[in-house]
Structure formats: C-alpha cells, structure tokens
Design a protein with these regions (language model features):
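Extracytoplasmic beta-rich repeat domains
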Residues: 31-35, 55-81, 105-123, 145-162, ...
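Bacterial Sec signal peptide processing site at the extreme N-terminus
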Residues: 27-49
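Short loop/turn segments that connect beta-strands within beta-propeller blades
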Residues: 100-103, 139-142, 179-183, 224-228, ...
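Loop/turn-rich, solvent-exposed surfaces of beta-rich toroidal or solenoidal domains
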Residues: 294-313
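Sec-dependent bacterial lipoprotein signal peptides
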Residues: 1-27
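Structural signature of WD-repeat beta-propellers
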Residues: 91-92, 130-131, 170-171, 215-216, ...
Length: 313
C-alpha cells in the first residue's frame, strides 16, 4: 500500500493564492460604487458630514457700564468677584468697590493701601492682600474692616474662602489657613520652590472639605481643610530642560475640580488630569499655559502660552 504525504504549508499557500485571484477577478466585474457593507439606514462613518448653515450673530444688550482707570493688572490677578447680587472689584491702587450687578449702582467704595492681589468674596466677607503682605478682610455689606493679618510674604493670587477659613497662597510657596472671623493663623504648609520661578501665582480651590492647589515646582497638592494635613500630591510635569530657564514648570493657574477629576496645567509642561479616587494622573497632553483649563459641554479647552487654543473631547 502506498501512502501519499501532502505538503500542508504549500497546500495552504496555493489555496490562499487562488482565493485572492478569485476575489480580484470578481471585484473587477462589479460596480464598486454599489458595493456597500452597511444598510441604507446606517451611517457611513467615513463619509463627511454635510455642512449646515448657522447664525453666529447674537443681540447683546448693554445694561450698564462702569469705567476704572486706576491701577494696573499686568498679572491678570485683579479679577471681579461675584456674590449674591453684588459684584466686587479692586485695583492695584487700592480702590475696592461693591457694585449692584443688576443696576450697576455703587453700593460702597473705599480707598485701601496699594494691593498685590484682587478680590475674593464669600460667607459675608471680602478679602484682598496689599503689597506689604497684609491680608485684609472687609464686611461685604458696608466695606468696614473686619481684621488685618500680616503673612510676612507677598500674596499675588486671590484667596479661597470657606465658612471657617480664608486660604492664602503666598508668592514664596506657602499655603496658609486664617480664621475667617479673626484672621488668626490656624495652620501653614511650605512647598519647595525651585531657584527660578515666574512672577505669578494660582489661587487655592476648596471642594468637599479639601484644598486643591498647584505650586511653582509643577506639582498639585491636596490638603485637608481643617488641619492642613497633606492628603496626596502629584507632578503635573517634571523639569527636563538643560538650563534653569528651560526647566521652568510653574503652575500659575488654579486647578479645576469636576466629575471626580482634577484638571491642571503648567508652563512648559502638561495639561494633566488626575483621578480623585485613584489619587494619580490618568491622562496628559503636552502643553504650556498660564491659564486654568476650561470644561464645558464635554469639551476640554486650554489657552496656550502663545495664545493658541487647544480643545479635546
């Protein structure tokens, strides 16, 4: 009896070659435009969407206008603060004002000393900082001084206000908690500063009994509000340049906390997203920005240091 042995490898190759030739010859006789692998009711994902007409014109009415030519805002830290129906503004020359946001009528206006940071408002108080390191709290109703506390350092960013505390971040990298009613220092934390930093600072953010703050060393820190105990921290980016100038990784923008995530950005670094539950970074994209990320309708946007805009879905 004779046995026949088939070369399996060669047999499979011949079958594959035959199938390829058959398919090519079959396709050449077909109308490729009519060849579809989806039903008529389904959407072809590769087909460009049709352009739709839309109107970009909106009618905006000017209810009221107030001009202020006092002081400068080079660092962009003199921004208005809203609370109830009032708008609070301050400038570097020391003018602090309370304005009715509906009518534009000035409720009260006072002259303070030269200021280094703008207004923060909440829980009945209004807080500013002057060039001598004094943190000053005013009564929101009439502008009367409630207390003044010297923190022995320049404060360049508006404070964060809670029912019990006023949280300050100084230009020297120190995070301070002052009693909201008396201005007494309750606790402090000092971060490690690099040798070279950008003049500017980010404001702390208070969410659910925790403080979120970005530092000049390019790190995000999370602290317990009542005690100042560090809960966790993470690097927004790492210094990697060959010189101190190219290694600047200052984070001069406030973190944004939303949906269990913390969105952060820094200069010559990253747009970085941290997960609150995991206490770690879960997504990064190379970026260089002085501004806080913007999250709106499922879109993440960041304004770059060169004024370009990046968006992510």
């Amino acid at each position: 009896m004779k046995y026949f042995q088939i070369n399996t490898y060669k047999f499979k190759n011949n079958i594959s070659l035959f199938l390829i030739i058959f398919l090519i010859s079959s396709c050449s006789s077909m109308d490729m435009d009519s060849l579809k692998f989806w039903e008529d009711g389904e959407v072809d994902l590769e087909e460009p969407k049709k352009l739709e007409n839309f109107s970009s014109n909106y009618a905006i009415s000017n209810n009221w206008k107030i001009s202020s030519n006092n002081g400068e805002n080079i660092l962009g830290n003199f921004i208005p603060s809203f609370n109830a129906n009032n708008l609070f503004i301050a400038d570097s020359s020391g003018v602090v004002s309370s304005i009715n946001s509906l009518s534009g009528q000035i409720n009260w206006e006072i002259q303070s000393t030269f200021l280094s940071s703008g207004v923060a408002s909440g829980f009945g108080v209004l807080v500013v900082s002057d060039v001598d390191g004094n943190v000053i709290a005013y009564n929101q109703d009439d502008g009367s001084v409630l207390w003044s506390s010297n923190v022995k350092a320049e404060v360049l960013a508006p404070a964060a206000i809670d029912a019990k505390f006023v949280i300050i971040k100084t230009g020297s990298g120190e995070l301070l908690a002052l009693d909201k009613n008396s201005g007494e220092l309750k606790w402090s934390y000092r971060s490690k500063l690099p040798n070279l930093t950008i003049r500017g600072s980010s404001s702390p953010v208070i969410v659910d009994g925790q403080i979120f703050v970005s530092f000049d060393n390019g790190r995000l820190g999370v602290f317990e509000l009542d005690s100042g105990f560090p809960i966790w921290d993470g690097a927004i980016s790492y210094a990697s340049g060959p010189s101190e100038l190219e290694s600047l990784v200052d984070s001069d923008s406030s973190p944004v906390v939303e949906g269990g995530l913390v969105y952060t950005a820094n200069y010559q670094g990253n747009l970085n997203i941290f997960d609150l539950a995991q206490k770690r970074s879960v997504w990064t994209s190379e970026s260089s920005s002085f501004f806080s990320p913007i999250i709106i309708k499922g879109v993440l946007a960041i304004i770059e240091a060169d004024s370009s805009i990046k968006t992510f879905s």
